[in-house]
């Protein structure tokens, strides 16, 4: 799973994109979930530091956020449904990815149902 956010502080920043991939024990891709861009208000986007604005502008994500109609709740629901289709039982697989600790803080704050599906172990990539 990978999240994109408007910054690094879950108290003031928000999730703007969720992408999920399910792998087997050898990290071979089993299923690719939807790449979900979440609409956020101009007020939420105004809290981004310039480095984040520049990054999301270059990637095209900022325009995609503004044009998206998907709510965070709907994105969370779709992601959870995808995970449950492919994961045998809750908390049975680790979260793998880059900046996992940061993603977990945002999941705790905004999408605790997804967080409760994850095992406490993790595999950090670089």
What do the PLM-derived regions correspond to, one by one?
Residues 41, 111-112, 125:
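A generic structural signal for secondary-structure junctions
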Residues 119-125:
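Conserved small/polar residues in nucleotide/adenosyl-binding loops
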Residues 1, 5-95:
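Conserved non-catalytic scaffold segment of RNase H-like nuclease domains
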